[in-house]
């Protein structure tokens, strides 16, 4: 039984949690509150870009796809001021280009360590460049097997990947369309946008502006920045313990669900069933989409979601119906879904908050 906000209830034999992305995490910065008047905690809110002075300055926290989206949206709405983009490493998404197909080079005998996989990928990139190819071909070749690679890694190696490789993987895997990349490049080269590598350390809000302290990654010097607005562009929150959502909170509090061991979503079994606090898969609660990232890693983009939904539908029909109709499996299709062919910045991909 599912209780809705208006007090009504729904009764179902199975419930699929397909909540999509949640708002960005709260930034644990001295002086900063999500209620601060000049701070925008979620760039996806309807009023996120309202009342920003057209000739003022804006600080975007995070340098992934979300910050690119916001920067482009600001300029589209006539913003003529300066855009500061701050993230720990100052890495921006790479630009997508049309490429040829690179042969699959990962197999069951490939390394099961982060370091070994890095060596393998770098060797393929060198081979591509020596043969007048492109590193993008190598990265794209991994897409059909990324979930298999993730599942093959022990927990310790998954953690090592998240600590050391994730930011670099994200900017190469989740690229931006050439026309969007050209706009961002022009903003930077014309002095209308600046990308900083560092960490925000303090926030002070005044009646007409904001002052932030941040530590420069290269020099380790403390710096001061004055802006009119600060926007959280760090991407969706994935740690379910921190998600401010009544449904997620209720599932955790009642023991119907538990976080995965990497805190990238909820723990699920291979069929997508939620695993409760005792470690038992639920017979009626399932998950679909980004909330399964901990077990699949690639669980955001459209091709993977189509396949995931098809597999889950087949499983549920097989379990709930006495004589279910045969379902034709949906194969992942990346053709036609590249960023080069999309009008928006994203290729239905995930935000990378740690770049």
Task: State what each model feature region is.
Residues 1-115, 119-322, 332-347, 351-355:
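Flavin (primarily FAD) cofactor-binding/catalytic cores of flavoenzymes
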């Amino acid at each position: 039984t599912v209780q809705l906000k208006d007090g009504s209830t729904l009764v179902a034999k199975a419930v699929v949690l397909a909540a999509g992305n949640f708002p960005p995490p709260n930034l644990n910065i001295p002086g900063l509150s999500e209620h601060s008047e000049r701070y925008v905690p979620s760039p996806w809110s309807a009023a996120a870009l309202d009342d920003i002075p057209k000739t003022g300055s804006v600080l975007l926290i995070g340098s992934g796809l979300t910050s690119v989206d916001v920067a482009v949206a600001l300029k589209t709405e006539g913003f003529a001021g300066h855009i500061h983009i701050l993230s720990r490493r100052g890495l921006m998404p790479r630009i997508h280009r049309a490429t040829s197909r690179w042969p699959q080079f990962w197999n069951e005998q490939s390394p099961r360590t982060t370091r070994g996989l890095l060596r393998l990928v770098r060797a393929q990139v060198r081979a591509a460049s020596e043969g007048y190819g492109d590193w993008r071909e190598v990265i794209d070749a991994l897409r059909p097997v990324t979930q298999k690679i993730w599942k093959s890694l022990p927990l310790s190696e998954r953690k090592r990947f998240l600590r050391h490789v994730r930011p670099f993987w994200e900017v190469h895997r989740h690229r931006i369309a050439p026309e969007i990349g050209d706009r961002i490049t022009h903003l930077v080269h014309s002095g209308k946008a600046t990308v900083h590598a560092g960490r925000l350390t303090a926030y002070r809000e005044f009646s007409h502006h904001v002052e932030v302290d941040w530590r420069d990654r290269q020099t380790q010097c403390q710096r001061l920045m004055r802006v009119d607005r600060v926007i959280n562009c760090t991407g969706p929150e994935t740690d379910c313990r921190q998600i401010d959502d009544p449904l997620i909170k209720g599932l955790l509090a009642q023991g119907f669900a538990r976080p995965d061991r990497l805190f990238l979503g909820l723990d699920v079994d291979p069929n997508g069933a939620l695993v409760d606090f005792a470690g038992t898969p639920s017979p009626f609660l399932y998950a679909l989409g980004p909330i399964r990232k901990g077990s699949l890693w690639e669980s955001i983009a459209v091709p993977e979601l189509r396949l995931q939904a098809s597999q889950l539908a087949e499983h549920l029909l097989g379990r709930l119906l006495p004589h279910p109709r045969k379902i034709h499996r949906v194969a992942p299709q990346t053709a036609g879904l590249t960023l080069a062919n999309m009008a928006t910045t994203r290729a239905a991909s995930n935000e990378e908050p740690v770049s």
